[in-house]
């Protein structure tokens, strides 16, 4: 049996993160979704390299630029606009 994919959401906006987590959960019911408010929280996590994808706010990508640059094929930058 394959392990469930793990998805990290790194964004300071809790409401947006929970909403995105719900959308992802509906598309991938078996996925493990972890929410982090800031890059520092993700960086301290023991499983920080185990994620299949990282959904990250633009500000947090800049904070952890070297981390996300090494994982650019897994990183999806979240932006907001009108």
Predicted regions and their residues:
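N-terminal regulatory/sensing modules of transcriptional regulators
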Residues: 1-82
């Amino acid at each position: 049996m394959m392990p469930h994919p793990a998805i990290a959401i790194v964004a300071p906006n809790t409401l947006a993160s929970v909403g995105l987590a719900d959308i992802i959960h509906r598309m991938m019911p078996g996925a493990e979704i972890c929410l982090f408010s800031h890059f520092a929280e993700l960086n301290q996590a023991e499983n920080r390299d185990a994620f299949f994808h990282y959904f990250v706010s633009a500000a947090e990508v800049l904070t952890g630029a070297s981390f996300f640059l090494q994982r650019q094929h897994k990183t999806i930058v979240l932006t907001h606009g009108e």
